[in-house]
């Protein structure tokens, strides 16, 4: 009990140790950071969207959206979901594990992501970007329950334990 009280007193009596006038340093080499990917890699990533497994039944309204991702590379009309797909795919190709969680993360809040596609006939699932990696455990997109603190707490803990991974939690639109 005395140790607990001593720790409480030490934490409770902390003095301010940061300068309220602190200014973050300005990055001077920002223009030297290369964030682009080669066109061939972009095309390889986009091609996963049309590599439907044999016997898999993609919903007829979804097929054109997936095809548009591939076509958008030809006319430079890349939308948000295609850009996200290219970013995730390029990170996977570099060997970086990715975990994305949120109440509607697999489909995307506005029906835009489609990271996991469900067969309309039998409910089987297909995760197109997993075609880029040999270990499917390197890419997880999961729908979590609508419990922000619990979901964020788990994802935070996951990110601490797996520092090399890109761990994201996506809040559901309108829930805040």
Residue spans of the language-model regions?
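Flexible, glycine-rich loop/tail regions that form catalytic "lids" or insertion modules at the edges
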Residues: 1-176
């Amino acid at each position: 009990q005395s140790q607990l009280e001593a720790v409480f007193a030490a934490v409770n009596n902390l003095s301010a140790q940061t300068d309220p006038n602190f200014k973050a340093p300005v990055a001077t080499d920002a223009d030297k950071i290369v964030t682009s990917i080669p066109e061939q890699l972009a095309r390889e990533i986009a091609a996963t969207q049309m590599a439907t497994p044999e016997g898999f039944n993609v919903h007829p309204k979804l097929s054109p959206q997936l095809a548009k991702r591939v076509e958008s590379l030809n006319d430079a009309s890349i939308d948000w979901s295609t850009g996200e797909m290219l970013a995730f795919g390029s990170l996977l190709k570099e060997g970086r594990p990715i975990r994305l969680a949120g109440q509607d993360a697999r489909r995307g809040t506005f029906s835009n992501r489609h990271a996991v596609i469900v067969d309309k006939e039998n409910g089987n699932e297909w995760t197109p970007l997993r075609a880029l990696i040999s270990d499917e455990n390197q890419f997880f997109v999961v729908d979590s329950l609508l419990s922000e603190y619990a979901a964020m707490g788990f994802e935070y803990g996951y990110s601490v334990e797996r520092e090399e991974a890109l761990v994201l939690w996506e809040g559901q639109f309108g829930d805040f």
